[in-house]
């Protein structure tokens, strides 16, 4: 027997029936399989009425865990983080949280779980309201230990320049093995771009960086181009800057394409 996807949805009462009073919803997230070596994608979506400490997480046999459009309390996040750290075999390698509100404490707990040793190589947090302080706490926790994380996405979290600078500190000097970093749609302007450009100069691991739909202007664009031309981000093949209205200098963009083309990117 196997459960590929686990979904929880709220159910409306029938006509004439009183709405149920849900005080606690205990969830057991389990992927069962008849083959010990097999893995499954596990999904929880659109769950409601979840309260502190009410989630039980069993992540064994889940290669990818996706949580979308739901509320997680700090107790839920703590239990989830503990499950990530405590997983001994056939553990998740990818975690995606989409439209799952995380405050700074939730971000810190996830970061600590990663720093304390998990099998995760990919972390995607999109539309989670991680914000500046949450980003700082997440990357500080990641920076304490060299994790296995190779892909990090913080798209659409409003992290701003301070959050961009926090990520820059994470990638500066190859303190991680990150190969893909995405910070799209985060209100990052020239200040954040300058910090990222400086970090790129000494980084040899990153292959792609996504800075689309931000507020980077001519100053930030020039700094990024100069960093790449100077040999920074020596493994970099893709630097996405579309959707930055003030970063449209054709000559600078042509220089960036030329520098990336020399590496086989673009």
Predicted segments, located by residue:
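Leucine-rich tandem repeat or coiled-coil scaffolds
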Residues: 2-266
């Amino acid at each position: 027997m196997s459960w590929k996807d686990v979904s929880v949805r709220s159910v409306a009462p029938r006509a004439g029936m009183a709405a149920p009073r849900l005080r606690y919803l205990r969830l057991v997230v389990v992927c069962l399989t008849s083959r010990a070596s097999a893995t499954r994608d596990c999904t929880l979506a659109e769950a409601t009425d979840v309260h502190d400490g009410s989630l039980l997480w069993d992540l064994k046999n889940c290669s990818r865990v996706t949580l979308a459009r739901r509320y997680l309390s700090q107790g839920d996040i703590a239990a989830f983080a503990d499950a990530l750290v405590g997983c001994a075999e056939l553990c998740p390698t990818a975690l995606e949280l989409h439209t799952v509100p995380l405050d700074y404490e939730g971000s810190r707990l996830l970061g600590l779980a990663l720093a304390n040793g998990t099998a995760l190589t990919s972390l995607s947090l999109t539309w989670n309201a991680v914000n500046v302080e949450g980003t700082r706490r997440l990357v500080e926790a990641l920076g304490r230990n060299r994790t296995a994380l190779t892909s990090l996405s913080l798209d659409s979290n409003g992290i701003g320049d301070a959050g961009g600078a926090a990520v820059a500190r994470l990638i500066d000097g190859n303190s991680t093995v990150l190969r893909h970093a995405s910070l799209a749609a985060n209100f990052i302007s020239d200040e954040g771009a300058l910090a990222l450009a400086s970090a790129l100069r000494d980084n040899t691991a990153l292959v792609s960086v996504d800075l689309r739909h931000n507020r980077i202007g001519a100053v930030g664009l020039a700094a990024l181009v100069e960093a790449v031309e100077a040999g920074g981000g020596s493994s970099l093949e893709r630097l996405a800057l579309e959707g930055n209205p003030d970063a449209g200098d054709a000559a600078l963009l042509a220089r960036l394409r030329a520098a990336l083309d020399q590496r086989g990117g673009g």
